[in-house]
Amino acid sequence: MNFEAISLEMSLMWLHKNNKLMGFLNQEAPEVNIFDQFLFEDRDKKMLKEDDEFCDPPAQTFNEPAPSTSKITDVDIEFYNSMAEEFDSPMDEEEETKPREASLDQTAPKKSKKEELLVKNNNFSTNNVKKLQFKKSVRLRSKRRS
């Protein structure tokens, strides 16, 4: 078989498979004639007009507030007000600053300037070593290529 025959056979199989699927879908959906659609549209429009004539007037206009469905009691209002007062009341400045200062002093002891310089020098020296190692590796690669 040549390529064209294989592709034709594959396309026929695909069409056969999809036709089965379309047949299954068409079984559930009723067939509607185009002329019937126009008749249904006219009938639907007439029914909508009749429904509009016999509808009750709207119970609420836009100017009136909507009736509330939840009932808030005086106890709820007092509870919410007390909660708001607790969160809104500022703390004393002395109470606020004392624990923070103490925690900073305890956790981070200050280093002397010599120690800070040593740390900086160590970082600097390790960075230099890394740079030198990189340069050596680049030189070795270039020598290998040539």
Curated annotation (Swiss-Prot):
Look up the domain of life of the source: Viruses
| Region feature (Disordered) | 86-124
The residue ranges flagged as biased composition, category Acidic residues, are 86-96
Quote the protein name from its UniProt record: Uncharacterized protein ORF79
What species is given as this protein's source? Ostreid herpesvirus 1 (isolate France)
